[in-house]
Amino acid sequence: MLIGRKVVIRFGEDQGLSWAAAVGFYLFLSIPPLMVAATWAGGFVVSQQTSSGFVVDQVSRFLPAERQLLTAVIHGGTGSAAYTAVTLLILAVSASRVFAALISAINVMWRRVDQLSFARRQLLRATLMAAAAGLLVASVGLEAGAGAIARAFGGSRSIDWLLRSQLVPVALLFAGLVATYKLVPRTSVRISSSAIGAAAATLGIRAAHLVFATYLQAFGGFNTAYGALASVAVLLTWSLIVSIIVLLGAELVAVLDRRRIPNRGQWTG
């Protein structure tokens, strides 16, 4: 309880909600072009239909949105070479800004933001973008492995669901967060602290996904308040929720590691 209280207090001191809003906004902007780009890249290996189906399956496990909406995003953005080129450009900019905001936010929590040189910022951005691409590739292998295990158990649907819809997303999310919490701070971070923070954030995101998806199914989403913009509101709200949880996990790592520079009132956040 004491650690949790300290995390919440420091999260407020570090203007965590404002940073989460920035990260969430750029995350929201990067989701559609990421889906289109992943489908386009997958089309070089398998058929476009197979690639789009795989991308929708993967995204739906992290995003509480209707499959029809996700499918429409992909179908509306593929087929035109010019559109794909623009999409890739938008993805490069928006994804870069997601990681830029995340890097700044986490280093604010460590009181190290003033020690980030321009070169290190660019290196961290490139590293995180490469790691994200690596996790996407890893998801293909894990998906195939999960299918093979399910078939070994006689094609059990329950085992297939457990592996593909639960264990694989959790493993990918946990691995990505451990790497983020370990590599981003401008100081040495213990892997044990990073793992604890990543585990807490992963559980928080999965629990929030369940609650948010249940709310959308039970109450029809944001249709009453936002009308035709309900889908946009859902994606933006979810991006904000995820960003808050990720930054709370980062704050937990800083509290556990006990290497954060004390607040001397010299920074503005």
What are these regions (language model features)?
Residues M1-G269:
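Membrane-embedded alpha-helices and immediately adjacent juxtamembrane helical segments
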